[in-house]
Amino acid sequence: MEKWTKENVLKILPVDDESAAMITSTALAVDSSEAAKDYWISLLGDSAETIEFISDFNQKRFHSTHSGNSPSIMKNKKNVTPNNNIRQKNTATSSHPSFYIANNKQKGYDEEMYKVNPASRNKSQSNNISSHEKSSKTTKNVSPGVMTSDLIPEKKSVKHNNSSSNRIEGLADIEKAIRQIEISQNINKAERRVCNCQGRKHPLNEAAPNCLNCGKIICIVEGIGPCTFCDNPVISKAQQLELIQELKHEGSRLKQAANQKRKSKTVSSKNNFQRLQNSSLHSIFLDPKQLEQKAQEAEERKNVLLNFDRTSAQRTRIIDEAADFDPTSLASDTWASPAEKALNLVRMQKAMAKKEKKKKKVLSISLSGKKVVVDQKEASSESSDEDQDELDNLTKVEGQSHSHNPKAPVIRNLPRPIYHQDLHSSHVAVPESILNKINQKWSKVQDDDGMPSML
């Protein structure tokens, strides 16, 4: 068997005796006929001669094994139940060709009908292979059902963009590639990283995808240095020099392109400058009437602004409606004048006092009449009169011009303190702590905001 296979391999392939012996030994080590067929087709191709050789090889190689197993099959047939015998008979009758059973009558057959010429046998084998492939395609299209494993979302396979890696986009990439080639020339084998992924884990090295001596597939991790398996250089020194020259040429081309872009930008900027310069020159040669009118308008605007700065009078009034609902924002108005700030501070204090009074209520409960009366002290009308006077004074101040120092406080509009002499009479017993505070001298200090404070 081995000798016959070796002779046929030498007829089909132009190889020596040793390689033919290796091919036959690997083919004889295959277990099934399908695996042997795939092996021979991948090695010899799918021509008519190879298909005939594959069929003869499978008959000689695997026919003896089936015939050796026939006694055990016959023993097992005796133990089969009658129902199984009936099924076997039905299948046996159905397995005969169409000319064997015709009109429910059994006919004899000649042995010559089963003798096939080698050319016709090759055609039939090729037809059988194509029909088998068609049937396998049809069976693949039929889905048996939904499995639990089908419900799991498939992982998206990461596709390496080889087109982007082939492009050289910048000078930094070119310098990096040249540096990598120079380093790979001087690196030792002990310092290199060995990777046996065969390009399945890492992308292939584009410069040298495999070793020409041993055929090892080289990935990016291993680089361009010598092969880690056979120690032979993957790229010769001449090829490395050619790569470096090509990379330098590409770098010079990119530099020229960058310089051209820079020159085009300068030309466009010069054109824009000339266009603006021409427009400015055109504006000079206007009608004298238009120039006089524009100069007069500018002079009037200048006089108005200078007058505003000289008088520094307040001509606008801001009505803050939000302050009616939030009294705490009255004193923090940055746009208010010092007089308005002082008045806002007094208003805020009064509003806070009113809010505190509303919280404190006195309830009078009459058990006899079964009534509850809320006793709340009403604010005196004097406070409203004082507020009205302060507002009138403020409107008068707003109509006048401000002083040169806008931070100076307007103290004349605030209520003055009143001294009650009855406290010092002998009829009233005043504590010593209060007397000390009354007799103490107060010093007036002005803070940064222009507000007076007593110390």
UniProtKB/Swiss-Prot annotation:
Which Gene Ontology CC terms are recorded? cytosol; nucleus; RQC-trigger complex
In terms of InterPro entries, this protein maps to: TRIP4-like, TRIP4/RQT4_C2HC5_Znf
- Compartments, record wording: Cytoplasm, Cytosol
Point out residues bearing the modification Phosphoserine.
70, 380
User: What domain of life is recorded for the organism?
Assistant: Eukaryota
The molecular function GO annotations come to: zinc ion binding
Q: Biological process (GO) annotations? A: positive regulation of DNA-templated transcription; rescue of stalled ribosome
The UniProt entry lists the main location of this chain as cytoplasm
Task: Give the compositionally biased regions (Polar residues).
Answer: 65-98, 119-130
* UniProt-annotated stretches for the region Disordered: 64-98, 118-148
Where is the signal peptide, in residue numbers? none
Keyword terms, alphabetized? Cytoplasm, Phosphoprotein
Query: How does it associate, per the subunit comment?
Result: Component of the RQT (ribosome quality control trigger) complex.
Q: What does this protein do?
A: Probably functions as part of the RQC trigger (RQT) complex that activates the ribosome quality control (RQC) pathway, a pathway that degrades nascent peptide chains during problematic translation.
The name on file for this protein is: RQC trigger complex subunit RQT4 homolog
Species of the source? Schizosaccharomyces pombe (strain 972 / ATCC 24843)
